Amino acid sequence: MMKFSFALVSIAAILGATQAQAQAQDCKYSVPESQLVKKGTLTMSVNPTLPPLQYVDQTGTLKGMRVELGEEIAKRLCLKPEYVRIEFSAMVPGLQAGRWDMINTGIFYTDERAKLMQMLAYEDQAISISTAKGNPGKISKLEDLAGKTIGVELGGFEERKTRELDKQLTDKGLKGMNIRTFENFAMSFQSLRAGQVEVALSIDSTGAEYQKRGDFERVLSGLFPTPVAVALKNKPLADTIAKVLNDMRADGSFQKLFTSYGVKPIDGAIVVKGPAT
């Protein structure tokens, strides 16, 4: 019996080693443990309040294009994908503190951010303005936002552009907007539904999704077009992920994923822009 048990253990060990070897051979790129927050894991931060690109379904499961993209990156690196759900305002400090490897929440690319982090722009995106159904404020142009109460997520590109727009209005002699910031976009749209704000600002994909559902009306779109990126602290890891994304472009899986969500990827190769070290 002992000999039989030992044989079973030996066979299991051989099979396990063979499986691990096969998996290693499937990995085109290897990531040293020193480049990761957690061994064998690609840890990513996400704020899942932007359907259809990143959201939580009725079962509590993370869904969306960006979630799938992160999972595919991890798969091609033979790493386990792990998401940390957190508000956007905490993401950059958390990245710098080493709490996660990558911000995968659709962070807009700016030159200022590229001075702080390794950024890989991969997606074309822009800003939308949504109102209650029927567009009660009759908003058809930016000037119609004068004097309106607008909801926006705190601390991001969207808030910055909202404040720039407010200045543009007042510089023209129009009334400024009453800007209300929220921890995330979901709370902003909940406030719009409750009539606490008159308009809500979001990305184009989310504004279109809410209109498709019949929840709100998207009255302005395509504002401030800017690429969206993933962001990392570790440059060697960022360089490796850029190679993975460009491999996906080459084999067609990148475009297939984007097309399924009606999103346009950037033109050209995906490159790393950030500090030298």
Feature-to-residue mapping (PLM):
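Alpha-to-beta junction loops
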Residues: 43, 79-80, 97-105, 148-149, ...
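A ligand-binding cleft/hinge motif common to bilobed small-molecule-binding domains
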Residues: 89-93, 106-115, 161-168, 190-224
